[in-house]
Amino acid sequence: YEAWSDASDKSIQSAKVFIENGKIAGVILREYTDKHVEKDFSTYPWPQAGEAARTLSAQMVAAQSADVDIFTGATGSSTGWIQAVERALEKASGTEPTNKYFDGTFLGRSETSSYGGYYKVVWVTLKNDKVVDYKAQRVLPDHTIQDPSVEVYGWPLEMARNSYKEAALASEPGYVDVITGATGLTHQSNHAVRDALDQALTK
């Protein structure tokens, strides 16, 4: 059973929980940057993060629960992993969920554009199966963030994003109709939003 935490401005955590004979047999914890790139704990410059992942995994198996102590020096990561494991255990419980999606903010990533070699990362906030907030950034091939004031569609990128956001709040999650003059942005945004929705699924 796999689930994700709420996304912060800097990262998002995921958990894969293995259940055997009704018990937690194993837990794999991962963490991703705000560019939706998985952190390699063997090279990541904050060693507490990798240590926290290993320690919390073992503690959760021992406790048969997500109810473990926050790892000192990795509070944000620990909180996210605990939430992700709690959500995975909800999926494993067999109880029919009330909603299709968990309430929260989820980080999605689009495909890479064949036109410019960039991809889009979006933060999608859900409540009662509706998108209630949305923000995005474009990650360039050199892994810098596109300045949103740059004109890309004959109008500033930020304006196109706002048009998409307005449509996203009003439409079925993940299915915004093509915005005139910003076809590529619409398709890429929908792809990234659906990726975030996949992370938010309650079963």
Describe the residue ranges of each PLM region.
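Active-site- and interface-proximal helix/loop "cap" or "latch" segments in soluble metabolic
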Residues: 2-101, 109-203
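Short, conserved active-site entrance elements at the starts or edges of catalytic domains
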Residues: 104
